[in-house]
């Protein structure tokens, strides 16, 4: 599971995801990618599930780049605990994803396999996505 080795603070505010992605909105490494179409918090488990779906469908051929990283801690209080008495303990890590952000990139496979693999990966994510391809140069 992905998570930061060290953070400045143990807990973070919930926050909101405003605007569209300015950085990370275009393909940087691979020929094909999966782009987010709506704002959402994506957990480390969801990223890992999508990565596994990608690599299994590609049968270890090609290369995968994960362009998002879960760096925001989400805290949770234990079950059946009354409100108050402070914020809960960090439970999981999430990545705040803005619309337009390229989340995954792949290379080394043909377009049909890339589209199938990224569709399988998209099914593991709580977000509407779009398949993007680099324009033939």
UniProtKB/Swiss-Prot annotation:
It holds the Pfam family Ribosomal_L16. One of its GO terms (molecular function) is rRNA binding. It comes from the Bacteria. Keywords: Ribonucleoprotein, Ribosomal protein, RNA-binding, rRNA-binding, tRNA-binding. Coiled coil: none annotated. Disulfide bonds: none annotated. GO terms for cellular component: cytosolic large ribosomal subunit. The keyword Nucleus does not apply. GO terms for biological process: translation. The keyword GTP-binding does not apply. Part of the 50S ribosomal subunit. Belongs to the universal ribosomal protein uL16 family. This is Large ribosomal subunit protein uL16. It comes from Rhodopseudomonas palustris (strain BisB5).
